[in-house]
Amino acid sequence: MRLRLCIYIYSLAVFYVKAPQLENYRAKHEHKPDTIRKEWYEMDKNILLTIEYDGSVFHGWQRQPDRETIQGHLETVLSSLLHTEILLNGTSRTDAGVHAYGQRASFTADVKIPVEKLALVINNILRSREKGSFAASPVRIVKAEEKPADFHARFDSKGKKYIYRIHNAEKSSVFLRNYVYHVPEKLDTDAMRRAAEYLRGTHDFKSFEASGSTPRQTTVRTIYDAEIIVNEESACSFKSMESEDSFKSSGAEPGGDRTSHRADRNIEIHVSGDGFLYNMVRIITGTLVDIGAGKLAPEEMKRIIEARDRTKAGHTAPPYGLYLAEVYY
């Protein structure tokens, strides 16, 4: 009897303290009863992070036991910072070696730190975990923002943009080995552009899904844009630092191209769409490279799409040239 009386008195106290605030909240969100229930009783903030990372030092995004992944790395830092277990909902499960400019991930927690300061605090902790006074973290939070309680980073996304980088040069650079796909054959970028036109629109992209992928309800996707960009003067083209004297002895002209007989080119393939199959961008890239190298005609792209057969498409480009550039909402 005493226990029931105590519970009753406590309930009345909570009601009289919270009721005015709840009524104000209800007036603004009458059309979202689920939101009221979740936000009011959990009292958590829903935080969306924009993340960039160097994928060459991780075993992909998704957490794995006994392996260092981006998701696991960040969850450890956030759980320690917020004194509670944090589970991130990422938009893209990038593979080992794949990088990101704009990965998005959300989580809910009772965050006391001002949201506008959260990215700075997390980045300071990430940096402190690295060895050496000048060591930089391979992961950085670009932005942190609060979203409505019913927001989900993955399920609410409207599309993504990927960039694939190719170093088209006779000789490769050791400094680029983890960040671009080196292709020594000169690529016909005009042919690649003609082929890319067939990708735009809504198609069944079964031919561009990795063999053995988990069966899914549909392999139909919409590609908003597919663009080939060429940069002849990229900062990624490393030149020799040898002296002019040693260069003259080789018979080359000072100031000339010291690495190859033709100008290095950095080619970027930009692909945006409402969703992507497993390895889809890498297989599209491999097919475009085969077309640029003259192994396939540009018109073959249309037949490859229609075939819905992985064996008809080109090779799978390596992961280290791929970047998750942006997630659309």
Regions of interest found by a model, annotated:
Residues 3-5, 12, 22:
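Leucine-biased recognition of intrinsically disordered, low-complexity hydrophobic segments
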Residues 7-9, 17, 30-32:
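Short hydrophobic alpha-helical segments enriched in small aliphatic residues
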